[in-house]
Curated annotation (Swiss-Prot):
SUPFAM superfamilies: YhbC-like, C-terminal domain (SSF74942), YhbC-like, N-terminal domain (SSF75420). One of its GO terms (cellular component) is cytosol. It comes from the Bacteria. It comes from Campylobacter concisus (strain 13826). PANTHER family: RIBOSOME MATURATION FACTOR RIMP. Required for maturation of 30S ribosomal subunits. Gene3D superfamilies: Ribosome maturation factor RimP, C-terminal domain, RimP-like superfamily, N-terminal. Belongs to the RimP family. Its main location: cytoplasm. It holds the Pfam family RimP_N. Keywords: Cytoplasm, Ribosome biogenesis. This is Ribosome maturation factor RimP. The keyword Cytoplasm applies.
Amino acid sequence: MDNLDKLIRECGVELYDSEIANENGRAIFRVYITKDGGVSLDDCEKVSRLLSPIFDVTPPVSGDYNLEVSSPGLERKLSKPSHFKASVGELVKVQTEAEKFAGRLVKADEESIAVENEEGIFEINISEIKKAKTYLEW
């Protein structure tokens, strides 16, 4: 993952995350990128053109797959401390083993986050988070 991060930085963007998905029996290697001011279609194309020949030699998954490069989107998965830090001030949904929280992310550091809603402020250790994402109110 570190090598992937370094390669992607050559295109002027940051690696947000990557995942392997399976849709309709086909493997998909998804690469999510970010940059200040937002990701353009040209950014995605640059990263795809950079990674494609490398993955032809050293595939990220075994067998046939499709490579997809995109921004993580407005409603995006949060899994790393850096994701939470960059999302302070946004609305989030967080699930731990015991509880679910929805509210505004008011604090984030390497160890924990704080989510505020009408019931109060809830401090949650990042290690206890099973699933988290940003969301928009419509």
